Amino acid sequence: ARDWGAMADEVRAIHTLYSTVVGHNVLEVEGLKPKKAPAPMTVSRLDASGGDLTVDGTACYPGLKQWRRRVRWDQSQLVVEDQVAAPADKPAVMLFRWHLGTDQSAKISGEGGNWQVVWPEGTLALASSVPLTVTQEKLPDNTVCLGKKDNGWDFLHTCVVVRTVQSASSADLTTTVRAAR
């Protein structure tokens, strides 16, 4: 027999954790609800050695002046440069999540705009134009353990939460991810 209560919990999780900004490594702006909208992508380079592309997600956040993300990668690292601008008269708290794909806790160190996150499989370095708080939380996963009920919906992975300390009219954040050696 199907446990309808458990199924309702799974449906709620889809709508609150998986299909929202919480479930993705993207921008969240406190007080703004993102919407589905075109996000033009410019590919500067894409080949066997890596790539370089820029996504303009501004239209996805009504009320935001700009969100531009540049992503560059090769075999050694992934570099993500986020440029976010709010209207001068409406500064905002900006937040990013980085899903690490591990159930192991991360070691977080740093202050102000410079932070480092280390976990068994890699490192994440943050350099920001504004002060940040960096924390971690456990979130359910349905990517690493796709669809495996015994180790899927209830599998929790580590998610790093990067948040501006206070409302800002703009923030530039560079995130560099490297695999452990």
Model-assigned labels for residue ranges:
Residues 2-181:
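CBM-like, beta-strand-rich accessory domains located in the C-terminal region of large
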